[in-house]
């Protein structure tokens, strides 16, 4: 028996076997969790259904976090299969492509700012609102952030602001939901070569710099993040809430890589 045996967890954001959400689902399944999944549109539905089968699940629900109706419907449908459940993984982020290239000040638009915050940050709150009536005591909510929430990252631009908003939401939600025993945390993951990351300019250079600078001198994997996520959603982490847990091979603690000899 794994430490998530008996837990029911909804996983969002699964788009490929390179997705962080895939690594999370894999680790959670290995620890005994029962999983459900969401998909954004008809194009992704067959792919997510195949992944769901891989993880022994037949619960695959549509979810477009851009609309409140879709969010409400998702959890209403989930409740027909699970009257109560133990948490969800919010692995959702988006900004228009023109917001992720070059000079932030010149690239920024009102609409781009709105979309980035709506999809990447507000959606976490909206999902918690809709899920709240169906959550078991001691449930755990988990989202995914990035170091751009704390530092200026080239080409990450408006997503730096959106992730900062997401991390603030994590703390405020934790304070609010804590009285019901519900924990809320975020993982700030190091850069991983995912479909989402492919939209960031010079991402290969970012990975190279990361590997040279991180305390462990390596990049992180979806397995690294998945194992940490499984722990945070388990009763082993019962005293942890409102935290931003860095799973980044120690990159965030360093100021520069090795200087070498003069």
From Swiss-Prot:
Positions annotated to bind NAD(+): 13, 19-20, 64-65, 92, 163, 192-196
SUPFAM superfamilies listed in its UniProt record: NAD(P)-binding Rossmann-fold domains
GO molecular function terms listed in the Swiss-Prot or TrEMBL record: enoyl-[acyl-carrier-protein] reductase (NADH) activity; identical protein binding
Signal peptide range in chain numbering: none
EC number: 1.3.1.9
Pfam family, one: adh_short_C2
Catalyzed reactions per annotation: a 2,3-saturated acyl-[ACP] + NAD(+) = a (2E)-enoyl-[ACP] + NADH + H(+)
Pathways involved: Lipid metabolism; fatty acid biosynthesis
Annotated site residue numbers, Involved in acyl-ACP binding: 201, 204-205
CDD domains found in the cross-reference section: ENR_SDR
Active site: 146, 156
Activity regulation details: Inhibited by 1,4-benzodiazepine and naphthyridinone derivatives.
Gene3D superfamilies: NAD(P)-binding Rossmann-like Domain
Protein residues bound to substrate: 95
GO biological process terms on file: fatty acid elongation
Keyword Lipid metabolism included in the entry's annotation: yes
UniProt keyword list: Fatty acid biosynthesis, Fatty acid metabolism, Lipid biosynthesis, Lipid metabolism, NAD, Oxidoreductase
Protein family according to the UniProt entry: Belongs to the short-chain dehydrogenases/reductases (SDR) family. FabI subfamily.
Primary role: Catalyzes the reduction of a carbon-carbon double bond in an enoyl moiety that is covalently linked to an acyl carrier protein (ACP). Involved in the elongation cycle of fatty acid which are used in the lipid metabolism.
Annotated protein name in UniProt: Enoyl-[acyl-carrier-protein] reductase [NADH] FabI
């Amino acid at each position: 028996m794994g430490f998530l045996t008996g837990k029911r967890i909804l996983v969002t954001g699964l788009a490929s076997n390179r997705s962080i959400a895939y690594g999370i689902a894999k680790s959670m399944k290995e620890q005994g969790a029962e999983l459900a999944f969401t998909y954004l549109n008809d194009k992704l539905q067959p792919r997510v259904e195949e992944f769901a089968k891989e993880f022994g699940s037949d619960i695959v629900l549509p979810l477009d976090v851009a609309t409140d109706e879709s969010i409400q419907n998702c959890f209403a449908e989930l409740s027909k299969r699970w009257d109560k459940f133990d948490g969800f993984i919010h692995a959702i982020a988006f900004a228009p492509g023109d917001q992720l290239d070059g000079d932030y000040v010149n690239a920024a638009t009102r609409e781009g700012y709105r979309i980035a915050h709506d999809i990447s940050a507000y959606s976490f709150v909206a999902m918690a609102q809709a899920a709240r009536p169906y959550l078991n005591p001691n449930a755990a909510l988990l989202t995914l952030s990035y170091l751009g929430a704390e530092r200026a990252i080239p080409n990450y631009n408006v997503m730096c602001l959106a992730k900062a908003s997401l991390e603030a939401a994590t703390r405020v939600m934790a304070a609010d939901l804590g009285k019901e025993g519900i924990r809320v945390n975020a993982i700030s993951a190091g850069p991983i070569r995912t479909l989402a990351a492919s939209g960031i300019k010079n991402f290969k250079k970012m990975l190279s710099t990361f590997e040279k600078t991180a305390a462990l001198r390596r990049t992180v994997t979806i397995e690294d993040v998945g194992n940490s996520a499984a722990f945070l959603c388990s009763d082993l982490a019962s005293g942890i809430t409102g935290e931003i847990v860095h799973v980044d091979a120690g990159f965030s603690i360093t100021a520069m890589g090795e200087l070498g000899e003069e």
